[in-house]
Amino acid sequence: MDSSKEALKERKKMAKDEKKRQKLEKFLAKKTLEIGVSKPRKEYRKEGYDPLQVEGKWYKLWEEQGLFKPVEGGARYVVPIPPPNVTGSLHIGHAMMVSIQDAVCRYKRMCGYEVLYIPGTDHAGIATQNVVSKQLAREGIVVDREGFLKKAWEWKDRHGSRIYEQLKRLGTSVDFGRERFTLDPGMSRAVADAFVKLYEKGLIYREPKIVNWCSRLLTTISDLEVNHEEVMPNTYLQVDGGKYEFGVIYHFKYPITADKGFSGDHLSLPTIEVATTRPETILGDTAVCVNGRDCRFSPEGIKEMLGDVPHGCRIYGVNPLTRDVIPVIFDDYADMSFGTGVVKITPAHDANDFEVSKRHGLPCKVVFDEQNRVVVEGEFKGLKRFEARKAVVSKLRDVGLFVSKKGHPQVIPRCSRSDDVIEPIIKSQWWLNCKEMARKAIEAVEDGRISILPEGAEKQWYKWLGNIRDWCLSRQLWWGHRVPAYKAPSGKWYVGRTKEDAFLKMRSECMGSDCDLSELEQDEDVLDTWFSSGLWPFATLGWPEETEDFLKYYPNTLLETGSDILFFWVARMVMLGLELTGKVPFSQVLLHGIVRDAHGRKMSKSLGNVIDPIFVIDGCSLEKLISTMRSGNLDEREVKRAEAVLRQDFPNGISRCGADALRFALLSYTSGMKDINLDVLRVEGYRRFCNKIWNAHKFVKTMVDELAGKNGNGPVCKDDYGKYIVSSAELPGPSEEGPVEWILRRRNETVEEIRRTLDSFNFMGATQAIHQFFIYDLCDVFIEVVKKSKNEKYIRVLFRVFIDSMKMLHPFMPFITEEVFSNYFNGSISVSPYPETDGSEHESKFSVTLQITRHIRAKAESNGWSKAVVEIAPGGDVNHADLRFIRSLCRKIVELKIISDAEDGPYEKVGGSRVLVRQTE
């Protein structure tokens, strides 16, 4: 290869390398390659940074010093933690959530804000009852309600404390003096008060309606807790203890007559063809629906089907299974383009049919009980619903009314908690009318009282709230807030904050009649978990009482949470906050995406890819990962699948990385609402970053120790306790020294960039900025210059810039930065002022020197030269004084020649100079 082609190749490589440094994703990809995916798990060498030794001591000291309690003086900044469920331990998704929140809180605290970061946990009604029930079943224990609640509280105490320990290990700077649990007495009072107030406003009411029934959990669930699974034609699903076919549409004949009192042989009647995906519900049909524009049911069409009947005569269907005579009704609900254009109406087991029944005054006939067994008298009684389906189809075949069975794409509603196929049933429940509250919540975003980030999320907000339905509050569970409603012997319900409160209301209506407190029976149901969670921003501060905390810290400032619960939780907090307090609960909503595994799969215990963040912090063997998974509530089939995933993804276990590396890795991924494919092994790259910080600290400490020893009472000296005192002269003024001016300019640029990105919640940009500054500018360049020169001015600048780097890193890496800071100063870095730009214009020509340096490095590395000879003809902004820095930064240079004329020969122009790099002979 000739020299010009070689030079072109090298220039392209340099440009590519520079581009990589400016783009985070490419940088992270490079780091992933450095880590590798099949290296065995390694422990730290004794001389390296050991996160466990450092991280283990600091949280207790922070708490003892009360550093996370709000300190008056600055503007208030309040962040409520989305309370984790007490169903188990925190997972990596929680770790990302608290890493984001804590980075914001620590940053704001250092900027002088009065920060309150509120911790707590959620009782998680359905989820906790489910895991406790599984545990009891596995142990063969049968309990009543009181016994179950005792077991559930034991579970909460065990796992709630585990969650708080995990939060501490992650360095979360919450004020544990204000921690709350959603079933605490104070929270329970708030829930009862909210229910009563909403009831008295006419927003809560009790009514029989179609609900989503889960027969495995034996409770209703909300629309948001239903997953709508699209299945292809003729798909078999495991449900109700067997495998059943879905994705099928059945056509059958419905006998019709003009005789309302028909009681003869229905098989001799004319028929119309009906299509359904649920033939088992024919047992509950109370009407047949056709479209009024369907010409088949015009007077002429009816005459053609039924013969000579009086004009305007009503026609009826005869249920092919029960022989009940039911009306044929006309409604636009019947879609003439779908199926046969004729729809059977089963109001008790279909939400749309239920609405049709209300319009036409149809009765509701229940087909299934709460265990999905047929309750209709006759040959099908007692069959489970999908067994009944097969029996019904067989019966229709036998009597000649079956037409066909065709594959058809279908959407199956499944419980997000149990995976059961939801059965719509009618139940009398407590409902919250959300329409007007939703309108107010929309207005709060439209007028700017609440901002939702990242941009674009508002569209989802408007769409969902604009189509909101009433909220079913009742849940058929034992674990949760009992509905504060009490039933009298008359059947009337009385709502009160307490039983005594409800009794007073009942007695006021007794009109002198005898009535007794014991006659009132509290509703057995509990409230939807999201109702109590919806009060979180203000109930945690003492509402409904006007406590000092409530008056001072409400509304909150920032609500940071996952985008997947925008409607489950965030919308309900806004609706309830506006309705009950008259104020928005917070001014900003920040949403993040879902954390998935390295393969892009959603994390699931049954898949074996849910990782406890403590396993990443402390390290974990494959054996422990498997044993921990086996100790859960998975069945044997799920255990086998999960174990296979663990063996594939973590053949050598997980290396010890520390909390700082985990936090930094999670934050470096975070960009808006995009889902994150987290490769746990990539955290190891940031563990090595911690080691780089530690080694830099050891060098800086050596340098400033020497400087302090020389200066006595100089600009950097020690107090009587061995801590450093830095005078106002710590930073030299403008100087002709290239490296000093250059590093101060880069320091200012980095401070400005991190402040900008953190203020806009761009954690990816913030972590990229400090990582690149620390590695490529401070360590790779300035520390190398200081090593060679040991110039006092350089050391003082190094000290200041290094400490500022620790402060910039602190919101992301609280432990190692606190450890480093404590080696130099009294007090905590967490309450030290965040760096600001110094206001000086630091102009430096040193960047040209670095250009030449990088060219020399790239040339030597690309050719595999361990030693090189360099010839430079200085020009442009480079003079002979700059050349000493080039030598100190390029260790591969064994000879550096300064020449005056480089017009001839294979010299390349770099930064105004002519440069030749060649291998030593």
From Swiss-Prot:
Binding site for ATP: K605
Any one GO molecular-function label of the UniProt entry: ATP binding
Motif window: 'HIGH' region: 84-94
EC number: 6.1.1.9
Recorded catalytic activity of this chain's protein: tRNA(Val) + L-valine + ATP = L-valyl-tRNA(Val) + AMP + diphosphate
Main location: cytoplasm
Keywords: Aminoacyl-tRNA synthetase, ATP-binding, Cytoplasm, Ligase, Nucleotide-binding, Protein biosynthesis
Pfam families in the record: Anticodon_1, tRNA-synt_1
Subcellular location: Cytoplasm
Top enzyme class: ligase
GO biological process annotation, one example: valyl-tRNA aminoacylation
Segments passing through the bilayer: none
Region (Disordered): 1-20
Entry-linked InterPro entries: aa-tRNA-synth_I_CS (IPR001412), aa-tRNA-synth_Ia (IPR002300), Anticodon_Ia_Val (IPR033705), M/V/L/I-tRNA-synth_anticd-bd (IPR013155), Rossmann-like_a/b/a_fold (IPR014729), tRNAsynth_Ia_anticodon-bd (IPR009080), Val/Leu/Ile-tRNA-synth_edit (IPR009008), Valyl-tRNA_ligase (IPR002303)
Listed GO CC annotations: cytosol
Family: Belongs to the class-I aminoacyl-tRNA synthetase family.
Protein's UniProt name: Probable valine--tRNA ligase, cytoplasmic
